[in-house]
Amino acid sequence: MASHDQSYKAGETMGRTEEKTNQMIGNIEDKAQAAKEKAQQAAQTAKDKTSQTAQAAKEKTQQTAQAAKEKTQQTAQAAKDETQQTAQAAKDKTQQTTEATKEKAQDTTGRAREKGSEMGQSTKETAQSGKDNSAGFLQQTGEKVKGMAQGATDAVKQTFGMANDDKDKDHFPTNRH
């Protein structure tokens, strides 16, 4: 009977061992499941943190880009304003120079007219006093007066920029070539 007892005890031991093994496997499975859930939670937390960081970086990049855009617009506007001011100053200076040139031309024209009138009067007086002189003398005087009048006319034309370069080249040489 010993063998039957031994067999019974062996079966009993085996049953207990199997039960304990199943309990240990159950505990290991529970712990594995808990570890799995904990790992999933950690992964989700990391994913959420990464998403938040990426969103914050995206927003910061957008803010920086917007600030750069605004700064560029401000700089462009300032450059535009400066250009307009410079152009206006140049326009004003040109108008002043034009006005001064016009006044000088009018003054020169007035003086040329006076000189021409004086020459005409002088010619008239010379002609009257020299009526008795020979025709050659009168012709010579007339040519001189004509030359002086032509010189005054050319000076006025040159002042107004109406001179023909080829015609007046001998009287008013220029450095333009």
UniProtKB/Swiss-Prot annotation:
Region spans: Disordered: 1-177
Induction trigger: Up-regulated in response to water stress.
Stretches the record annotates as 4 X 11 AA approximate tandem repeats of T-A-Q-A-A-K-E-K-T-Q-Q: 53-96
Tissue expression per record: Highest expression is found in seeds. No expression detected in adult tissues.
Ion transport found in the keyword field: no
Keywords: Repeat
Biased segments, Basic and acidic residues type: 28-39, 90-117, 164-177
Biased composition (Polar residues): 119-142
Start-end of Low complexity biased regions: 40-89
Residue stretches of each Sequence repeat: 53-63, 64-74, 75-85, 86-96
InterPro entries tied to this protein: LEA1/2/D7/KIN2
Recorded family membership: Belongs to the LEA type 4 family.
Name the UniProt record assigns to this protein: Late embryogenesis abundant protein 1
Source organism (scientific name): Cicer arietinum (Chickpea)
Lineage: Eukaryota, Viridiplantae, Streptophyta, Embryophyta, Tracheophyta
